[in-house]
Design a protein with these regions (language model features):
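Secretory-pathway glycan-assembly enzymes, especially type II membrane glycosyltransferases
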Residues: 11-17, 21-28, 34, 41-47, ...
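C-terminal extracytoplasmic interaction modules
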Residues: 438
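A ubiquitous short alpha-helical element
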Residues: 37-39, 361
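Residue-level marker of positions within ordered structural domains that often coincide
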Residues: 1, 58, 245, 269, ...
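Catalytic binding pocket for nucleotide-activated donors in carbohydrate/polymer assembly enzymes
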Residues: 305-435
Length: 438
C-alpha cells in the first residue's frame, strides 16, 4: 500500500471536512452500539473497533474518530492488500470522516490505478445516487460525490458501491485511448441524469456493466457452481418457475395488486390446475404499511424461497422487471441452461448486454401484460427440443460474457459518454445501441 503509507508518513490531519447537522437514524446508532459491544455475532474484532469510531461520527466527534482510525490503519496497513474485510471496514470509516486522500490512495493501491485518484465532495445538486467523474489532460482522475451523502448515515452504501465499480473505472483509466472531460455516473437502479448508467431506455444514457456483475467478476461463483452441478435437460421439470421480491412499486403501497410481479403471481395462480407454474413472492420489500403486508401475506401468493442453485431444476425460468431490469437474475437464469421466458419491459428498459440477446433464439419473449404467458409455456412443453435449444443458446451467450470481455467492451461506451458531454453532435452510439422508439 505504497500511496497509503506515504500519506500516513506525512501525518497531516484533514483541513476541509464538511460538517452537517447529524441525522443518523436511531436504528443505525443502535446497530453501531451492538457491533462495538460484540452483541452481534459474525463480525471481526476490526469491525467492532471501527464501529466504536463510527459512533463518534454519529455524535459529530469527527476529529477523535479520525485520530483513532488512523491508528488502526497504521497497525493494519501491511495486511490491507490481503484482507478484504479489514479493507472495506476502514475504507467506509475513512470515507465517513472525510479522509478522502486516504480513500483515494487505498483505491489506487488496491486496483493498480495508473494515476492519482482524487475523491471529493461538492454541492453538485445531482443527488446521492450519482457522482461526477473528471479526467484531466494530464491523466488525473477526480470523483466527486454530492455533499448530500454526508447528511445522514448512508455513507457506507455510497463508498461500497463506488468500491464495487472501481475495477471498471480502473480498467478504463489504463487505456491509452481514454478520453478527457467530465461525465456523470448513475449508480441507482435507473438513470437519473444523462451519463453512464446500469439500466435505462434513453439515448443519452450510456450503459455499462453494473455493480453486481463487476465485483463478482461476471458472477464467476455462479458459473463455477452451475458448471459442476449441471442438470440434464431430461431431468428438469416442465414447469415455468419464478421467485422474487415485491420490487417495482410505482405508486401507493395500497395499489400493490397493480405491481407487475404480483400480476405474474396471480396469472400463475389462475392456471395452477395446469401444473405448469411454480411462481410466487419470496420476500416483501419496499412495503412498510402493516395492513398491506398482512394483505399480501394472506393472499396466497407468498411461497418459500428457492436457492438460485436450484433454478436449473425447471425447464422454463420467468424473468421480469422489478424497480428496473432484473440485473443478476437474467444472467444467472441464462447460465442454468433453462429456457428463459423474459417478460418484455413495459418501460423498454435495457442493460448493456441486451443487444446481444435475440428473441426466440436466446430467450422466449413474453408480452408486457403477460397475456401470452400460458400459451407460450404450453407451446414449449409441446416443442421440448426447441425449448432445450433456446436454453443452450442462452447459456452460450451468458458464458461468453466474461468479466474480461465486458470490461473491454465498456471502453468505447465510456469514451462515447465523455465525447457526448463534450459535443453531443459528435457522438456515435457504440455496438448497436440505438435510441428507444418509446
Amino acid at each position: 500500500m505504497e500511496h497509503v503509507q506515504t500519506i500516513l508518513a506525512d501525518n497531516q490531519p484533514t483541513t476541509d471536512r464538511q460538517v452537517f447537522p447529524v441525522r443518523w437514524s436511531d436504528a443505525r446508532r443502535e446497530q453501531l452500539r451492538r457491533l462495538a459491544s460484540g452483541e452481534i455475532q459474525g463480525y471481526s474484532s476490526i469491525d467492532r473497533v471501527v464501529s466504536q469510531y463510527l459512533q463518534l461520527c454519529a455524535d459529530g466527534e469527527f476529529q477523535d474518530a479520525e485520530n483513532g482510525l488512523l491508528d488502526v490503519l497504521r497497525y493494519h496497513a501491511n495486511v490491507l492488500p490481503k484482507d478484504g474485510e479489514i479493507y472495506i471496514s476502514l475504507l467506509n470509516a475513512l470515507f465517513t470522516v472525510q479522509r478522502l486522500d486516504l480513500v483515494g490512495a487505498m483505491l489506487r493501491d488496491r486496483f493498480g490505478f495508473p494515476s492519482n485518484v482524487n475523491v471529493a465532495f461538492g454541492d453538485l445538486g445531482i443527488g446521492a445516487a450519482l457522482l461526477q467523474w473528471d479526467i484531466s489532460a494530464d491523466g488525473e482522475h477526480r470523483f466527486t460525490f454530492d455533499s448530500s451523502v454526508l447528511r445522514d448515515d448512508n455513507t457506507r452504501n455510497e463508498i461500497l458501491n463506488f468500491y464495487w465499480e472501481f475495477p471498471l473505472l480502473a480498467h478504463y483509466a489504463a487505456q491509452p485511448e481514454a478520453e478527457t472531460g467530465s461525465v456523470l455516473l448513475n449508480r441507482g437502479d435507473i438513470g437519473q441524469r444523462p451519463g453512464l448508467a446500469y439500466c435505462d431506455n434513453r439515448p443519452d444514457f450510456f450503459l455499462i456493466p453494473d455493480a453486481g456483475f463487476v465485483p463478482s467478476e461476471g458472477y464467476r461463483w455462479a458459473r463455477e457452481v452451475l458448471k459442476k452441478n449441471r442438470i440434464p435437460w431430461q431431468d428438469r421439470r416442465p414447469v415455468a418457475f419464478w421467485r422474487g421480491a415485491t420490487t417495482g412499486m410505482k405508486s401507493s403501497q395500497r395499489a400493490w395488486r397493480g405491481l407487475e410481479r404480483i400480476r405474474l403471481c396471480e396469472i400463475a395462480r389462475t392456471h395452477q390446475n395446469t401444473g405448469l407454474f411454480d411462481v410466487g413472492i419470496s420476500g416483501l420489500t419496499q412495503i412498510s404499511d402493516p395492513d398491506v403486508t398482512r394483505e399480501i401475506m394472506d393472499s396466497g401468493l407468498v411461497l418459500g424461497r428457492v436457492p438460485w442453485q436450484d433454478w436449473g431444476l425447471y425447464k422454463y425460468l420467468i424473468i421480469i422487471d422489478g424497480n428496473s431490469s432484473p440485473y443478476s437474475n437474467l444472467i444467472q437464469a441464462l447460465l442454468t441452461g433453462s429456457a428463459a421466458l423474459r417478460v418484455e419491459s413495459s418501460r423498454a428498459l435495457r442493460q448493456w448486454f441486451y443487444t446481444d440477446l435475440i428473441p426466440w433464439h436466446h430467450y422466449i419473449p413474453i408480452a408486457p401484460d403477460m397475456s401470452d404467458l400460458l400459451d407460450k409455456v404450453r407451446w414449449l412443453v409441446r416443442n421440448d427440443d426447441y425449448a432445450r435449444k433456446v436454453g443452450e443458446n442462452g447459456r452460450a451467450v451468458a458464458e461468453a460474457m466474461t468479466i474480461e470481455r465486458e470490461l473491454q467492451r465498456s471502453v468505447p461506451v465510456i469514451s462515447s459518454a465523455f465525447r457526448y458531454f463534450r459535443d453531443p453532435s459528435a457522438c456515435v452510439m457504440p455496438y448497436g445501441m440505438q435510441p428507444s422508439s418509446n
